[in-house]
Amino acid sequence: MKHSYIKVFLTLCLLLFGFTTQAQIVSSDEDEVIITDNQGNEEDIDFPEAMNEDVDSLLSLYHAKAYLSIDENCQMRDINPVFSQEVYIERLRSLPTVMEMPYNEVVQTFIDRYTGRLRRSVSFMLGASNFFIPIFEEALEAYQLPLELKYLPIIESALKPNAVSRAGAAGLWQFMITTGKDYGLEINSLVDERRDPLKASYAAAHYLSDLYKIFNDWNLVIAAYNCGPATINKAIHRANGEKDYWKIYPYLPRETRGYVPAFIAANYAMTYYCEHNICPMQCELPVKTDTVMVNRDIHLSQISEILDIDLEMLRSLNPSYRRDVVPGNTKPSPIRMLPTDITRFIDQQNTIYEHRASELLTKRSTVAVTIDNSYSRKSSKGRRSRTYNRKSKSLASKSVTIRKGDTLGAIAKRNGTTVANLRRLNGISGNDIRAGKRIRVK
């Protein structure tokens, strides 16, 4: 969800009019567009990561290879027609949306990007939308949100379920780990539900609903989806309480300023593609699938090899299992397959569970400790010897020579002991001692 880079702010006056005719595009290249106003202020905006996605990587996805094809009856020409500003304004105004879709030069730049350089990507996304848009609409409807939000994943991920951004956001809706967990998605070393289209869509709808309760403005909601509500509140504060996206624009993070224009352009391109000679890829919807619950760990390769199912298809149907391991031991976990394959799985599940299990699911629960007995004896002997030596030194006897004129009391005092102890150590019953003799003091 990281998207734009800004060098110099456009003036607030320009923003108040939504860039309508005062901004001018100076240049546009593969990664950024430079905009200048009539005061000479310049602004560089990076395109979202998804707008730089290589179309070949999109076409290499399993569902693209299996179910999408070029429409031979539609001639997609490379010529992108040029229309007047009035045409774009009217088309955006005519969109059946709750959210406002204003026109300005920034929006125009993103429209040109989608309908120009990204024509093949739009063709792919129009075909792939047959898989995902019904899921998005179902989740958005459940939270009573505007259905035009279904195009948010266009700018987030280019409808690539396994997309991962440079910042670590993942899935169609590009959740960061913390936000994903906050909205109930399981994320660990084996499972990443950010990649599950259904679960991630409901989590995204929930998050968008919460953001609208905070801001009550859909443009601010979209911006907050990109940079977080706290950052939007800071921008509002710096803009003296203004709650219009285009008025707080100068105070937004660099990566957020192209976000709303990109969203507007995505709605335009996914609606008016015909007017720009873009042909959607034909989509042959796959047969319906179902899930089977497993309560033991299982690897997708075990299923693939025993049931002769394309492993790539299993991965496509179960994108949340990031290492192909379904952790059924932790809790009952679903595996999505064709209904006929589920029947075969149930019939052969014992064989499937046992197939290459020691190779694919090696995870020891107990381990034996290997002991070298010869080393152990030597080590133990050394420890005992060291202990004995320490004890011997601490308990070693000590004797001193009795001086002329010495008494037991004087000897005891010099050596930190008592007369009674001297008598006990030396077997003395009285005080009779002789100078020059040895007496034990310890």
What residue ranges belong to the model's regions?
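Extracytoplasmic and endomembrane cell-envelope/extracellular-matrix remodeling and assembly machinery
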Residues: 74-124, 131, 142-143, 187-190, ...
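Alpha-helical scaffolds flanking conserved acidic
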Residues: 146-154, 170, 218-223
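Short, surface-exposed glycine/acidic/tryptophan-bearing loops
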Residues: 106, 163-184
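An acidic, Gly/Ser/Thr/Pro-rich helix-cap/linker signature
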Residues: 5-7, 22-143
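Bacterial N-terminal signal peptides
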Residues: 8-18
